[in-house]
């Protein structure tokens, strides 16, 4: 059986004839291999087609019978090889394949009026070695090609598309020229139609062009093309506005915040064990804070950010001497004298005021003689020299890497400038807030002036500088260390000079004092020897644990029929601070959270906030009262604090998460 080639004619393809040779040459892009069941040889189809001189004029008055409107003899339909008109085209050795393909393609076009077969728009002509030389094959291709416009015109009326999902297009036909290339290959160029062609398996795409006409300056055909709006602006858009869009976009990045001094993309090494480098968008602001984001979008939205306080940090550059180490006052004798050369070789030098000129000012005489091992380590460290490190006062390290040396030096210099500016602004802020510091000093002085606060509450050491918040007492530094070992449940230690003191804490300390506290915690210490300033730490610790942890010296409760919780409610309502402290020292968490009777549901915290007494409210919270508790009316303690207009109570309750809304 001969080798088979197929040529599919599409409506978007026009033909050209050579007036001299007249050969019809289908384009190579329109010739494709058959399916897996077809067999194909490498002979080109154009070489098998005999030339013929044909010129066809197609106009508006041209009317042709379409191929599918013509009746086919029954003999040809069922046995094409038996018909003399078709025997030269369809050979007996391929008639089975031809019939099966023709029937499968024409199943949906059977006419109910006439017993004839109608054929699809997309016609397929089968060519093999023995049929490509027939003299009327050229006319067959021309007839099929010229009747395509008639089919498309009639298709709009029937609404019967031969090809599924094919859209309707307008069609106009002008003069069709068919010519053959000199190289023997064919080309089919469309000069008149805008109809999309059916898909082709060819690797080359056909080129379409519209020739100029003599009558009109515009093309003859009216193209109906669907343009993509992917790169076009919307209707009614302002061109000037579009040109200004990039500028406005750059201006709106990070709007509403301080403009960074320096910003850009840097690589940051993760702190996990993988040690991977990821891109981060880093900003450096004038407030001395270095912030890095996962991306530029996160920076614009101000989300997923992490900040580094440069005021308490320093910067290190691998392979660079620290600025303080460049002094000529301290020569380095050997590499084993003080370890500075080791730090230099390993690239861990500290750079506080780095600049390119600083490293060059170091005298070569001061450099220690390098050893072979040191040179090897230094060579290994030079593999990545565009990185720098930021180290905080707590030892946390952030590794960053720039793309070039210049970019790294620019970042290092900018960060060093902000570190220096932050330190200077810290000094200036201290000088500006001298009046506030003086007022705080006066408040702390009032705490020290409380009765008994001139000496340590446990060992009588003079001028104590440490405090226990929930006990309301002052102590020496040695006793404060023992109090810390008790835990915050028993003693909350704070420095009188180093820590901040809000208003509510100052009020608590100014309301209790050492004498009042000792009258409660040492109320039953008769016959016990209290440690002195010269006592050992073991003696002081033994006394403190017996006093606060075991409560051996605690004053007894008053004799009454009321429970401890009811006594606490009454003392809170009467604002009796000394009795309340005694009851809190004896009571448990359940007794502290006891509510008022008669269905009221108020706790001692509700009563303290109703009175606006921040001292009692704070002490109750420290001793375990439920901040989320509500009374019978669904009100929290914050509701009563707002009714009493006590801002101190409101601040304390909000700090501990008290809900604001009623149920």
UniProtKB/Swiss-Prot annotation:
Belongs to the centaurin gamma-like family. Pfam families: Ank_2, ArfGap. This is Arf-GAP with GTPase, ANK repeat and PH domain-containing protein 4. Residues 188-202 have a biased composition (Low complexity). A zinc finger (C4-type) spans 456-479. Residues 185-216, 231-255, 359-381, 519-540 are annotated as: Disordered. ANK repeats lie at residues 600-629, 633-662. Putative GTPase-activating protein. Residues 235-250, 531-540 have a biased composition (Basic and acidic residues). It comes from Homo sapiens. Keywords: ANK repeat, GTPase activation, Metal-binding, Repeat, Zinc, Zinc-finger. Encoded by one of the numerous copies of centaurin gamma-like genes clustered in the q11 region of chromosome 10. Residues 441-561 form the Arf-GAP domain. Residues 259-420 form the PH domain. Residues 203-216, 519-530 have a biased composition (Polar residues). InterPro entries: Ankyrin_rpt (IPR002110), Ankyrin_rpt-contain_sf (IPR036770), Arf-GAP_GTPase_ANK_PH (IPR051282), ARFGAP/RecO (IPR037278), ArfGAP_dom (IPR001164), ArfGAP_dom_sf (IPR038508), PH-like_dom_sf (IPR011993), PH_domain (IPR001849). GO terms for molecular function: GTPase activator activity; GTPase activity; zinc ion binding. SUPFAM superfamilies: Ankyrin repeat (SSF48403), ArfGap/RecO-like zinc finger (SSF57863), PH domain-like (SSF50729).
């Amino acid at each position: 059986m001969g080798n088979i080639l197929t040529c599919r004619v599409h409506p978007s393809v026009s033909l050209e004839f050579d007036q001299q040779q007249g050969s019809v040459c289908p384009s190579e892009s329109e010739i494709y291999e058959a399916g897996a069941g077809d067999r194909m040889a490498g002979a080109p189809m154009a070489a098998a087609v005999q030339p013929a001189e044909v010129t066809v004029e197609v106009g508006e008055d041209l009317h042709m019978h379409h191929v599918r409107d013509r009746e086919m003899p029954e003999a040809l339909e069922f046995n094409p090889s038996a018909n003399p008109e078709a025997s030269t085209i369809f050979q007996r050795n391929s008639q089975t394949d031809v019939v099966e393909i023709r029937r499968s393609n024409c199943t949906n076009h059977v006419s109910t009026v006439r017993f004839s077969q109608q054929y699809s728009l997309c016609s397929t002509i089968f060519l093999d070695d023995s049929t490509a030389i027939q003299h009327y094959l050229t006319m067959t291709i021309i007839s099929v090609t010229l009747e395509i416009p008639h089919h498309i015109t009639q298709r709009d009326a029937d609404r019967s598309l031969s090809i599924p999902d094919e859209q309707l297009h307008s069609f106009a036909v002008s003069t069709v020229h068919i010519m053959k290339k000199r190289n023997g290959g064919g080309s089919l160029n469309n000069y008149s139609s805008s109809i999309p062609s059916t898909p082709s398996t060819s690797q080359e795409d056909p080129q379409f062009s519209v020739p100029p006409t003599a009558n009109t300056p515009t093309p003859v055909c009216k193209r109906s093309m669907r343009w993509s709006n992917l790169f076009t602006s919307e209707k009614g858009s302002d061109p000037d506005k579009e040109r200004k869009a990039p500028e406005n976009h750059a201006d709106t990045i990070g709007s509403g915040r301080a403009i960074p001094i320096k910003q850009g993309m840097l690589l940051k090494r993760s702190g996990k064990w993988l040690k991977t480098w990821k891109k981060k968008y880093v900003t450096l602001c004038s407030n001395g804070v270095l912030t890095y984001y996962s991306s530029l979008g996160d920076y614009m939205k101000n989300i997923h950010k992490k900040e580094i306080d440069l005021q308490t940090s320093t910067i290190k550059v691998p392979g660079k001497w620290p600025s303080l180490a460049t002094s000529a006052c301290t020569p380095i004798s050997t590499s084993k004298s003080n370890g500075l050369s080791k730090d230099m070789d390993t690239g861990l030098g500290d750079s506080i005021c780095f600049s390119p000129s600083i490293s060059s000012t170091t005298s070569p005489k001061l450099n220690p003689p390098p050893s072979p091992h040191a040179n090897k380590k230094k060579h290994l460290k030079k593999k990545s020299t565009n990185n720098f490190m930021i180290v905080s006062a707590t030892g946390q390290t952030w590794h960053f890497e720039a793309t070039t040396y210049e970019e790294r030096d620019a970042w290092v210099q900018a960060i060093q400038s902000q570190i220096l500016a932050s330190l200077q602004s810290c000094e200036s802020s201290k000088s500006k807030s001298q009046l506030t510091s003086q007022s705080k000093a006066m408040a702390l002085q009032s705490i020290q002036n409380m009765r008994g606060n001139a000496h340590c509450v446990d060992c009588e050491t003079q001028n104590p500088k440490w405090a226990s918040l929930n006990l309301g007492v002052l102590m020496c530094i040695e006793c404060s260390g023992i109090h810390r070992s008790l835990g915050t449940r028993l003693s909350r230690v704070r420095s009188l000079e180093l820590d901040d003191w809000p208003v509510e804490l100052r009020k608590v300390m100014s309301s209790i004092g050492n004498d009042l506290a000792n009258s409660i915690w040492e109320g039953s210490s008769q016959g016990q020897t209290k440690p002195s300033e010269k006592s050992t730490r073991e003696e002081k610790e033994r006394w403190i644990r017996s006093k606060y942890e075991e409560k051996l010296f605690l004053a007894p409760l008053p004799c009454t029929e009321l429970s401890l919780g009811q006594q606490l409610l009454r003392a809170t309502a009467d604002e009796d601070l000394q009795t309340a402290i005694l009851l809190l020292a004896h009571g448990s968490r359940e007794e502290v959270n006891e509510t008022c009777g008669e269905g009221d549901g108020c706790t001692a915290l509700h009563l303290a906030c109703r009175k606006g007494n921040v001292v009692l409210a704070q002490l109750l919270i420290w001793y375990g009262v439920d901040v989320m508790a509500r009374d019978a009316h669904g009100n929290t303690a914050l509701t009563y604090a707002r009714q009493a207009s006590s801002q101190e109570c409101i601040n304390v309750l909000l700090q501990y998460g008290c809900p604001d809304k009623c149920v």
